[in-house]
Structure formats: structure tokens, C-alpha cells
Amino acid sequence: MTVYNINLGIGWASSGVEYAQAYRAQILRRIQQPAKFIFMDMILADNIQHLTENIGFLDEEIIWLYNYFTDIKIAPTTVTLDQVLAQVAGQPERSEKEGKIVRYFYPQDDQFITCYLRQEDQDSVEHVEYVSRGRLIRKDYFSYVRYASEYFAPHNDAATLYQRRFYHEDGSVAYDMLIEDGQEKLYRFPDRIFYSKAELVRYFLQCLQLQADDVVILDRETGIGQVVFEESQKAKLGVVVHAEHFSENASSDDYILWNNFYDYQFTNADKVDFFIVATEAQKRILEQQFQHYSDKQPQIATIPVGSLDQLTYPKEPRKPYSMITASRLATEKHIDWLVAATVQAHAQLPELTLDIYGKGSEEDKLRRRIEEAGAQDYIRLKGHADLSQIYAGYELYLTASTSEGFGLTLMEAVGSGLPLIGFDVRYGNQTFIDDGKNGYLLPVSSNHVEDQIIAAFVEKIIALFSQGRQQEMSQHSYQVAENYLTSRVEAAWTQLLKEVRDDSAL
């Protein structure tokens, strides 16, 4: 029995879906359940191994769709500059280095190559661009060997990608992919041709040779849902619901508008062996909705998408008046509201600090806001970090997200005994924040009046630090966190997979 977990992409600023999968990988390892994590997107900006290792996957757990048809293993980049140069005819006349970019010039051939290093202080090359007569003609991608190339031709005075090639370890061609208008149009193998990605995905799933006791867990389905459903029927199919699954405002007693990311799965729920949600509240709502709006009654299991190996206690006293938030720095996380609230609250609590962990598209904008407020001394952007031992140094966790399917950072925060302040929204905040006991739930309205929101945060921040209840609230957070200890989540996964195995044996 193997558990195959299907996702689309992964990046350095991964979403909660990828972190949920990484937690799941740890749990499945601990209960000795063989598992694979499959990524279906084209990922060439970075070696996928660097991205998956970064959040805790093991190389042998990873299947990348486009690499699957080769004999090249998922592995870190180790090809060196010297190895790259050895494959280029002639000797470079000069070179330039700036950060992680090294450029070699061959004026006798009117060409240069640009090497992109994995790290500035190393000579491992992730990919190389070849420019001839001022035009980009090829890119090569490396791990421990070259695993892919992209070919370009001039079109409308711009380099246009027209072909990708994937290799075996010995350098022979595994297959070619033809590109038209930036879209994958054709996949040419030595013994077959596919004319769409759907056909390629179907062939891939058939190559897995799924058995009755295998389990396919679909984490994201955009563009692949129908094929996965059809090819997984010989195994057991599970679907994980990672977010709010319906639009409350657009639903009525006669009609429900499912979240478009789950519409296909819910519409075809009779083909699903089980759904997984992260909270009991979401399970209750989804069960009621299936009863009310459909004739399908699928199995729904509640399994937290993360877990805590143990509760974490501070090794030294927490820093007074210290606050932390952690998330992707994206617009929907509304970190700007937390910055504004901290600036206002700081006027009354001059020792107040806020550390912001995470990376994302809003980072530069947030940095400017902090600088414009003159708040650099007490609001800091901390980037990515392993937060497991960091939370316990703070006194309060803030979240301004208006929708959180579970909230891994909320779980981690209560596991380190932090009180929390966030909106009274399903499901994560209402699960981890017991209003008035380990923090505060703030009212939220659909129109998001910014001044009112910021004022509400300011009021509760000042209240929490002024009432002297931090220790009492901290203890209540630890009590909430006990429900998410790894031992309990392991038991939930063991039970679900046992039920699946028993059912497949019938």
C-alpha cells in the first residue's frame, strides 16, 4: 500500500497546502506508511529538490511529473562551473561575477554564457543561458547531471521558447516537449506521442500501476481533476479540503456555491472514498451541506493538517510586550493592518515590538510602510526561519487573515503557549482562539473598513498587555494545543488508512 499525494507546484514562499503536505509526510513516516508526493507543474526556475527539501520532504518521497519519465533521480545540484565550461567549445576571454550570476564571454564566436549558481559562495550551477549573436538560444538545467534544456528562436524581436528536452543520466533524450505561444502542445517520446497535458498525466497515472489498496490523495486539482478521478478509481481516492469550501454570501436555501477549487470534487463526491477536513467545525458544516444540497453522503474525516511533536516552553523569560506574526507576505494576509495597529499601540505601549516572519510579494511594500512610520526600531521583517523554537520567546501572536482553513502558524503558536488575536472567522481562528481565555476574536465585516479593523486590533493589544493575564492565557493556549500533539494525529491517520485497507479487502 502506497499513499500518493497529488499537488501542482511548490516554491520558496510555499502556501499552507505545501506545509500541510510536509507535516503529512512526517506523520506517514512515523507510522511507517510508504508515501509519495507528486508535483504536476513545470518547475524549472529552481531545482525542485531544493524546494522540497526546504520544507522537509525527503528526496525519495518526491515524484515530479516531468522528471518521472527519465532515470534521473531527485537530487540537489552539484554540477560545477568547471563541468559546465568543459562542455563549451573554446576558452572564454573574460568572465564577470555578480552575486550568484557568473558570465563567460567568447567574443571570437560572438557568444556568452550566463551561469546561475545555487549559492553565491559555491560553484554549483543550477542553470545556464547560452546567448549567440545577441540572441538567447538555449537554457540548460542541472542537478547532478543536466536534466533538461529549453530552446529559443527569435520571434517579433524576442527570444521565444519553442521546445523543451528532458534527458536520462547518460545524456540521451528521454522525450521532447513542443511549445506554442507559451503552452505545452505536444510530448514526443521514442514510442508514443501525447497531444495534451491531460494525456501525459493519464499516462503517468497508468504507469504508477495503482492497486486496490493504494490511496490517492488529491490536494489540488486545477487542470488535472478529471484525469485523476478517472485513473484513481482502481485505488482509493481521498480529497483534502484546505480552505473555506463554499461562498456563504452567494448561497441560499436552494443553492450552494462551492469554492471553485473544490467544485469538481464535490460534484463528483460519489467517486471519492473520503474527504479530509482539518477541523470538526468544517466537518459538521460540510456534512450538513451534502445532506441538504445533494444526494451524496461521502465519508468525511477530521485530521489536522499539522501536528506538534511536543509543547514548547520558553527556555528563558519571554520578551515583554513582544508580538509575532508569520505567513506568506501576501495581500490576503493583511500584514499592513498589523503594522498600522502596532504603530498606534506603540504610542501607549512604548516597549511594544512586532516581528514579521515570512517572504512574499508584499515585502517591499511593507518595508516602505514601516520606514514611513519610522517604526524600524520596533517592527522588523525577519524573513524565513525555523520558528519551532522561536515562538516561545514572544508574548502574543497576531493574525489578520480573513480566511484560514486551519492555520498551521496558529497551531504552532498555541503549541508554544502564545495568546492570539485574530478575526472571528472560520475555521482556524475559531478553532485555536478561545475568546477571552487565550486571546481575542475580533468582529469582521465584508466591507473591511480599515480604520475600524486597526482600532479593534489596537484595543485588544493594549487590553492584553494591560490586564496582566498573559500567563493565564498562555496556559489556556497550551491546553488547546494538546489536541494537536503528533501522537493524536498519528492515531487519526492510522485509523483512516486502516478503514481504507479494510474496505479494499472486501
From Swiss-Prot:
Q: What is its EC number?
A: 2.4.1.-
* Residue ranges of the region described as C-terminus R-fold-1: 196-306
Residue ranges for the region (Extended beta-sheet domain) are 79-195
Name the SUPFAM superfamilies on file: UDP-Glycosyltransferase/glycogen phosphorylase (SSF53756)
Do you know which InterPro entries this protein is assigned to? Glyco_trans_1, GtfA, GtfA_EBD
- Give binding positions for UDP: G16, V17, E18, Y19, R328, Y357, G383, H384, A385, T409
Q: Which GO terms describe its cellular component?
A: cytoplasm; plasma membrane; protein N-acetylglucosaminyltransferase complex
| Residues noted as binding N-acetyl-D-glucosamine in the record, renumbered to the chain | H242, G405, F406, G407
Top enzyme class of this protein?
transferase
Location (main, coarse): cytoplasm
Q: Please state where this protein is localized.
A: Cytoplasm; Cell membrane
- Offer an example of a GO molecular function term for this protein: glycosyltransferase activity
Q: Where is this region: N-terminus R-fold-1?
A: 1-78
Q: In which pathway does it act?
A: Protein modification; protein glycosylation
Membrane topology term reads: Peripheral membrane protein
Keywords of the record, alphabetical order, are: Cell membrane, Cytoplasm, Glycosyltransferase, Membrane, Nucleotide-binding, Transferase
Record PANTHER family: GLYCOSYLTRANSFERASE, TEICHURONIC ACID BIOSYNTHESIS GLYCOSYLTRANSFERASE TUAH-RELATED
Q: Which family does it belong to?
A: Belongs to the glycosyltransferase group 1 family. Glycosyltransferase 4 subfamily.
**The protein's role, per its UniProt record:** Required for polymorphic O-glycosylation of GspB, a serine-rich repeat cell wall protein encoded upstream in the same operon. Catalyzes the first step in glycosylation by transferring N-acetylglucosamine from UDP-GlcNAc to serine residues in GspB. Part of the accessory SecA2/SecY2 system specifically required to export GspB. Upon coexpression in E.coli with GtfB glycosylates GspB constructs. Glycosylation probably occurs intracellularly. Requires GtfB for glycosylation activity, it has no activity alone. Does not use UDP-glucose as substrate.
Question: What is the protein's quaternary organization?
Answer: Forms a heterotetramer with 2 subunits each of GtfA and GtfB. Part of the accessory SecA2/SecY2 protein translocation apparatus required to export cell wall protein GspB.
Q: Domain notes, please? A: Has 2 Rossmann-like domains, called R-fold-1 and R-fold-2. R-fold-1 is interrupted by an extended beta-sheet domain that loops out of the structure. UDP and N-acetyl-D-glucosamine bind between the Rossman-like folds, which move closer together upon binding.
* Name of the featured protein: UDP-N-acetylglucosamine--peptide N-acetylglucosaminyltransferase GtfA subunit
> Which gene is annotated as encoding this protein in its UniProt record?
gtfA
